[in-house]
Design a protein with these regions (language model features):
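C-terminal motif of bacterial Sec signal peptides marking the signal peptidase cleavage site
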Residues: 6-10
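Non-catalytic macromolecular-recognition regions in eukaryotic signaling proteins
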Residues: 12-165
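Sec-dependent signal peptide recognition
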Residues: 1-2
Length: 165
């Protein structure tokens, strides 16, 4: 009887679930944020029109091969619709749900980390977002994250770079 009581008491010390971040990372581990946007309205792409109208290719085929219906104004729609700068989600984080993510630190040599703290957001899948316009100065910003779930906390250091230019 005493052995059963000891066995049951020992089970209470086990932390439920797990959290693994040793393979965590971003497919694209950096993002360029432009201070000066190209707001030129896009114009029709003559190459796209030639492929579709003359050669008979479908618009879908052209887009899949990097030939788009318009050219120019790379940030025109970003400005017009207020689309934020966004990263890809982080990959390789495994564990018992829910897993919470937060920014652990932001480091920079030339920029201003405090200003980046004010505008940078991270969502539950590790996607970073910044508003189209901000007062973050030019520089390279290294970001570290903290992942937390029930009973576990792990850091992923210097996992993403934001280049403001």
């Amino acid at each position: 009887m005493m052995g059963v009581c000891m066995l049951l008491g020992a089970c209470q010390d086990v932390t439920p679930g797990y959290l693994q971040t040793e393979y965590a990372g971003y497919t694209m581990d950096s993002m360029v944020v432009k201070k000066v946007l190209d707001l030129t309205p896009p114009v029709p792409n003559p190459t796209f029109e030639m492929y579709v109208n003359t050669y008979g290719y479908t618009p879908e085929y052209c887009v899949q091969n990097g030939i788009y219906p318009t050219i120019g104004g790379d940030e025109y729609k970003r400005d017009k619709y207020g689309w934020p700068w966004t990263s890809t989600p982080i990959e390789g984080v495994e564990g018992t749900r829910p897993i919470f993510v937060s920014i652990k630190s932001i480091t920079t040599e030339l920029g201003n980390a405090e200003k980046m703290w004010e505008v940078l957001k991270v969502s539950g899948d590790g996607t970073f977002s910044m508003p189209v316009y901000s007062d973050v100065p030019v520089g390279r910003y290294r970001i570290s994250l903290t992942f937390t779930n029930e009973g576990y906390t792990q850091d992923v250091n210097d996992c993403f770079t934001i280049i403001v230019k």
